[in-house]
Structures are given as structure tokens and as C-alpha cells.
Amino acid sequence: MVYKCAHCKQTVEVDKDMKGVRCQYCGHRILIKERPTAIKRVPAV
């Protein structure tokens, strides 16, 4: 999965096999999940 570091704004690749989640560039622990660029439309009820 691709995340963005909240501190240095670098794109970080995270695997499930990693022990803990940290930015590989600055060591910060807060990562933001990247959203897809496609817009998903849902019909109204």
C-alpha cells in the first residue's frame, strides 16, 4: 500500500511483513493513506 508521510510529505511503500510502520526517510510514524484519483458515484436512495 502507498502512504504519504505527514511530516516530510514523501511517498512511502508499506508492506504487511514490516514490523511497525515508519517513514523510511524521516522516521515519523504518522502516515496518511493515499486516495485513488477515480471518483466513485453511488446512486441516491
Swiss-Prot record:
Gene3D superfamilies in alphabetical order: RNA polymerase ii, chain L
Main EC class the enzyme belongs to: transferase
Pfam families in UniProt: Zn_ribbon_RPAB4 (PF03604)
One GO BP annotation of this record: DNA-templated transcription
This enzyme's EC code(s): 2.7.7.6
Keyword flag S-adenosyl-L-methionine: no
Cofactor: binding comment: Binds 1 zinc ion.
Compartments in which it is found: Cytoplasm
Keywords, in A-Z order: Cytoplasm, DNA-directed RNA polymerase, Metal-binding, Nucleotidyltransferase, Transcription, Transferase, Zinc
Assigned GO CC terms: cytoplasm; DNA-directed RNA polymerase complex
Cofactor requirement: Zn(2+)
Residues that bind Zn(2+): C8, C23, C26
Listed InterPro entries: RNAP_P/RPABC4 (IPR006591), RPABC4/Spt4 (IPR029040), Rpo12 (IPR023464)
Catalytic activity: RNA(n) + a ribonucleoside 5'-triphosphate = RNA(n+1) + diphosphate
Subunit structure: Part of the RNA polymerase complex.
UniProt family annotation: Belongs to the archaeal Rpo12/eukaryotic RPC10 RNA polymerase subunit family.
Its job: DNA-dependent RNA polymerase (RNAP) catalyzes the transcription of DNA into RNA using the four ribonucleoside triphosphates as substrates.
Protein name as annotated: DNA-directed RNA polymerase subunit Rpo12
Source organism: Methanocella arvoryzae (strain DSM 22066 / NBRC 105507 / MRE50)
Organismal lineage: Archaea, Methanobacteriati, Methanobacteriota, Stenosarchaea group, Methanomicrobia
